[in-house]
Curated annotation (Swiss-Prot):
PANTHER family: NR LBD DOMAIN-CONTAINING PROTEIN-RELATED (PTHR46397:SF3), NUCLEAR HORMONE RECEPTOR FAMILY-RELATED (PTHR46397). This is Nuclear hormone receptor family member nhr-164. Signal peptide: none annotated. InterPro entries: NHR-like_dom_sf (IPR035500), Nucl_hrmn_rcpt_lig-bd (IPR000536), Znf_hrmn_rcpt (IPR001628), Znf_NHR/GATA (IPR013088). One of its GO terms (cellular component) is nucleus. It is found in: Nucleus. It comes from Caenorhabditis elegans. Orphan nuclear receptor.
Amino acid sequence: MDYGRTRRKRLLMNGSDESENQYAQHYVEFLETMSYTKFGVCAVCGFSCQVQYHFGGVVCGACSAFFRRTVSLNIRYLCDGDNQCKSMLKKCRACRFESCVKTAGMKRSLVRRKKPTIKTTPLYIKNRETHVRNEDVLRAFIPSYTHPSPANETVEDKGKFSEKLKLSHGNILKFYINQVRYAKRKNTNIFTIKTTEDFMRLVNFQRKIADETCSSFPGVELIDENNILILRKYLQFSSVWIESTWTYWITNSSVSVDNMEMDKRLKELIEHVKSTLLISLSQLKLNIFEFAAFKSFFVWKLVFHKTSVAMKTIGQEHYECVSSALKSYYQTYTSMDSTEIAVRIGEITLLLSLVFVSKIDLKSKSSELNFQQIYHDMAKLYVHLGLPF
């Protein structure tokens, strides 16, 4: 017998001496203890099967498990079809997760997240062979669910953990590497677009990624919403312009922007980025580890907008952790000595300093990198094209 529904109907139709608070308490207790299972259609996958209340929505067990795993492990899926795939269950997990939230009404807050007690393998494997590929190095980032004994931990591994960000230095660098790897795989950037509409689609796509990525940034829970909005601006700018430039260089692409159907201001800005940033990155020849570090430095440089002391503190923590992880990478996977490592990191830092030169005469030094000018020109362009900024 459905006690909860019968009691609710009797109270509503016949009245009761119980107060509204008492009724609410009874009904909440009913909702918490009820077992609602029936044969129906899952709101997510559309299959006819046994459905039940899971995390705020009536779905099948498979979609419930998919939603719980995605949220608890903080997985972010991305869709090539702008989250409009028709065959969600079989092909696109991004659309399946979006359907869980928007169609079924499932709530992330009802999922218990995994406790951060999982041990991870060391960031780098001891190997000084010069022919080791980047893909082999990245395998050292894969989490391990085993619990190594203290005897297997080296002295240099101790102390490489950020108490503020609650992550090891290596995992923080890994966070940025994963972003760069996805952008490289997509191979869509400002230098391969042919029309203004292509550019607007690229910006909107990167804005969506920035919105999703910001929520998973290490330490983002320590800053307020206004500063998170600023972080999104920096992240979107770095993805559209800086990351696109590096991806364009690393893939050895060659696309001319002459006679393309695009806005004049957009074409001029692309040419300016190509003649400054592209040249600077091609001279340094940054690999994926170095560029991921450079991107993290840029995102947290925080000079274009006024930010709080808390955000500056988190930014400094990111800089120190990523710098430490990058140094360990050089020591482990290259034959560079301490002096060469210092020089290399200095070159990357120098590029960052050129990025934020505030006073440069573009007429007399048109080939010198000036990101403040690029950032301001980008803001004006977005307003001109009607893009939110």
